[in-house]
Structures are given as structure tokens and as C-alpha cells.
Amino acid sequence: MKSLKIASVLSILLLSLTVLQAKTTVTHLRCEWLENPIGLDAPHPRLSWRVETSRPGYLQAAYEIVVGANRAEIEAGKGSHWVTGTVAGTTIPLVYEGHPLAPFTRYYWKVRVRSADDSRWSEWSPIAYFETGMMELTNWRGTWIHDSPDYHIKPAPYFRKEFASSKEIVSARA
């Protein structure tokens, strides 16, 4: 009888330690269902994520999101465009409700979550980004390139420009 009590107490302690050791991570950050998209024209994009944990029966009870145009401020946990603070809820995807987004701008964001059964937050997710596009036709600044006003003629022209960069290229697009 005494050994049964000891075994029960040890089982409960081991289970408690397992729950305490379980790590919860936020992964697969998406904006409009895409990973780090560019050219978004949505003024209120939808943000989503996946919670990965070894804890059985885990249920997200709250989240916190920070969004800003500067990666360093997001790394510091501050966002210039949207800081939700603690929001109770499990809603995913979440609609962006921060300051208006500017066209042709890259925004960085991260999220952390809290479970329903304790008050511990997960670690912050890795930083993700999304980049806005034109947003409105009034932001169009280019002119059409063409070789003839006659639309019955020939295939499209081929444009190219070769160049040499003296520095390492960090990002490029055409």
C-alpha cells in the first residue's frame, strides 16, 4: 500500500516535470497564406502561425504580435506600426489592425503565444516579413515601354542591361 502511494506521487512528479520541460515554439509565420511575401496590396493583411509543442492537450489562450518597418526594433520587441499587447484568443488568421501600411515598404513581425493552462509565454517566433506593393493605382509612377504604336507588329522587344557591382548584392529584383 505504501509503495503504491510512493509510485503515485513519483508518477505525478514526473508528469509535472515533463510538462514544465515541454517547449512551445511558434513557427510557420505566414502573411496572406504566404511565407515572407512581397508585393501585397492588402491594406489589412491576414497573419497566421503554427504552434509546435510536446505538451499534450496544448491550447493557445493568448498571443502578442509586434509589427514594424525596422528589423532592429522588432528584435527588441518594439513595433512602430502595431503592438497588440496581450490579446486573449485563438483566432488564426489574424487581420492586421495597426497603423496604415505604406506602399513599397517591408514590414517585419513576430509573435508569441501563451497556453490556457499556465501563464508562461512561449519564446518569440523567428522574425518574418511582408512587403507591400503599389496598394493603389495612384502610386503607379512608371511609363509603358514599347517600340511601336502599331499593335499588329512583331514580338515583344528584349531589354537587358549588364552591370558589375563593386559590393555584395544583398537583394535584387526586376
Name each region found by the language model.
Residues 46, 106-110, 171-173:
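Short, conserved beta-strand segments of beta-strand-rich sandwich/propeller modules, principally
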Residues 1-6:
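Positively charged n-region of N-terminal signal peptides that target proteins for export
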Residues 8-18:
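Bacterial N-terminal signal peptides
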Residues 28, 62, 93, 124-129, ...:
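Well-ordered beta-strand positions in beta-sheet-rich domains
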Residues 22-56, 126-136:
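Pro/Thr/Ser/Gly-rich low-complexity, intrinsically disordered linker/stalk tracts
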Residues 51, 58-106, 112, 116-124, ...:
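Recognizes extended acidic, P/S/T-rich segments that occur
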Residues 28, 46, 60-64, 171:
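Exposed beta-strand and adjacent loop surfaces of beta-rich binding modules
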Residues 136-174:
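Beta-strand-rich recognition domains
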